[in-house]
Amino acid sequence: MKFHLWNAAILSATLVACAPPQPPVLTPDPVTLQFLDISDWHGQLDPLSFGSGDTAYQAGGAAVLSVYFKQDRAANPNTLTFTAGDDTGGSPPLSSFFGEKPAVEALNLMGLDAATFGNHNFDGGLSPLQGLINTAKFSYVSANLTNLDGNLANVKPYRIFTVGGVKVAVVGLTNPEARELVSPTAFGSILITDPVAAAEKARLAAKAEGAHVFVALTHLGVTSVDATSKAPSGPLIDFANNATGYDVIFGDHTNVQYSSTFGKTLVVENLSKGASYARVQLTFDRNNNTVLQSSNTFVIPKTTAVTPDPAVVAQLAPYRTQLAAQLDTKLGVATDLFPRANNNERLGEVALGDLVTDAIRARYGTQLAVVNGGTLRSPLPSSYAPLDTTLRRPGPGYQSGPPYDVVAGDVYSVLPFGNSVVTRTVTGTQLYAVLENSVSALPGSSGRFLQISGFSYRYDVSKPVGSRVVSVTLDTGAPILKDAATYTLALPDFTNAGGDGYTMLADGQGTSRELDAQVVLDAIKTQGTITPNPNLGQRIKAVTVP
């Protein structure tokens, strides 16, 4: 035993003697870097309205955000500004009617440095997206898109910025399911790989180039928060738990405000459309190449606190003038708001969903109509800003309501994607599969959740995915069974092509009709006055079945 201990002592001494000398700890040289981030902006060029009565306020909009960002940069010039996908796509008419060019031009003026891609960046396909990339004065980065050659140019996995004497690597990551959330041809031959593996590969490459701070722009979000433990879940949390070596991870995609630390990594997601933005402070020791601390503050960019940036106002003015001739036409009157908030249209029946699906079903005389919750992008009336200030509108600068005047721009804000309605038949068996997909993500929110008309159904979220639908009933009271009986259905062409996981419908059936926005626009003109359904919860009900 003594012999073994003596040998061990010699071995230990030898290892100590052979170990490489540790670099001396130098006197700290701290610098604070600032990162600004907006999530899921969707070309929201105009401010949004929040609250009511004495608590009402407006926030966001390109000209307002631009001033806030300038103030932040004046306070700390060592600043980078980001967005983590869906900066365009699903946008209000002021951007969408001009191919999203106004949004990218505004982001240039707002001083954006880098962005990644979300699914909505691909809404128009590759050629329009390439045009926007070429218009951008900032960098688009995504490390988990492959086969870019021949599809998209000027897209790199990451970009290294030197800020405050520190090399900061900004790595982009696209949500893996993005291909199924847009038209099947929108990505060309581009494939999406695992974000964790791609993030590690990009980080190591950037590190080899001398980067010391690592930021991930991910189009990944928090999908739910446990009511009891308050523990979050979702792709952003999964990524944060598995990615290594990142100092800040920005999330996106789900319109959830979240900020926490995972070990030494700060993880942040904002509310969408500029309702809030993240202001991250990261202190880095330049002598010892270590992050000393990081923190985040959510900023609500209220319109009353600043004067809008005149450069952005001027940039948007010609687009507004062109748009007014098409979309300022008054269609009718809404007796109250048709709200869109808190992802409710992705969780249950909402008045806006009833309005749209009822209009589509009435237009084509089908028994059933469905629309993905993710199709509905704005309340009604919307943030669209007609030039006529005598109209009754929710925001400042107009006559007050309710009732509210509804214009064509509102409808195109609610339904900006240019989807055509398709009419077809489905069997009872197919309809059950459709509804199972609709409720598959619950209790988390998902754009696949369907708003419906012409029927009702009950589901039990405690049951396994694929076995949650309990019963389906026509408005006539007749039950729909899981059998070969057929029913007529109207739905968006995106859904009929298998988007959002509706592969059971991608069988080549269906007759293409008019644009969904045109159908709803005509319905409001015909009705004259529209009222939110006061009996929500009758079409879609959660139940518990023993």
Name these PLM-found stretches.
Residues 14-17:
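C-terminal motif of bacterial Sec signal peptides marking the signal peptidase cleavage site
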Residues 26-38, 44-68, 181, 186-196, ...:
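Catalytic centers of hydrolytic enzymes
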Residues 19-307, 311, 347-359, 440-442, ...:
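Acidic, metal/ion-coordinating pockets
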Residues 1-7:
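Bacterial N-terminal signal peptides that target proteins for export
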Residues 11:
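N-terminal glycine-rich, Lys/His-bearing helix-loop that initiates the first secondary-structure elements
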